[in-house]
Amino acid sequence: MGFYLLGKLKLPNDSDVKHVSTPRLVLAIITLSFTMYMIPGLWGAPLKSISAFLPPMSTQDFVLSAGSAPAVAHNSGNHKYGEIFHAPLGLDAFFDYDEGLAYAKKMNKPVFIDFTGHACVNCRKMEASVWPDKEVLSRLSNDYVVIQLYVDDKTDLATAEQTVSKYSGKKIQTIGNKWSDLQASRFNANSQPFYVLLDTKGNLLVQPQGADYDPVSFSKYLDSGLEAFKKSVQ
């Protein structure tokens, strides 16, 4: 596009560009600069300024920002719905609330719930621009049991798990129905991303919050949950 604006590329019916006007030159510079900015993304480099509009980092073959924080081995085994969902940044996340909470109780660690969605632009922005931060990723990898719950997933639940919500009276037929009902009934919220920090009994450690694009601030939020958890087990 940039070369076309400069007259270096032409379509069959285009006339010769003998003079490049100032507006055309400015547009060409902007287009070429943006193209150069995006090129590193082909090899997995994070593009934070446009991360909200890009596919999840977990869909890339490799990510240059992954591994920026040391992680410990969890040995948590295969996870329910693990064939459907994939956590970003190599995180050992669960995709079922009860399974994740049971593992947190076993490991005596607090729970980080991420109510998210396939179509959630702000969720992707958090995963691409905040979660890779060294301090944030270290806490998510080592200090919390991460549970990602997709509220818009259309996969049908097993017949035995399909039910009617006591909260809304609506039929819970899909995975998304189940987790959106949990978010609404327990935490009175329906926006994503929505982050909840719990102890091993499922009790709130601190007030839930939504997107926070400041890594330092988000790290402090995670720290506040850790402090509350330590006090609860003393």
Each predicted region: which residue ranges?
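Proteins that catalyze or organize thiol-disulfide redox chemistry
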Residues: 1-113, 117-234
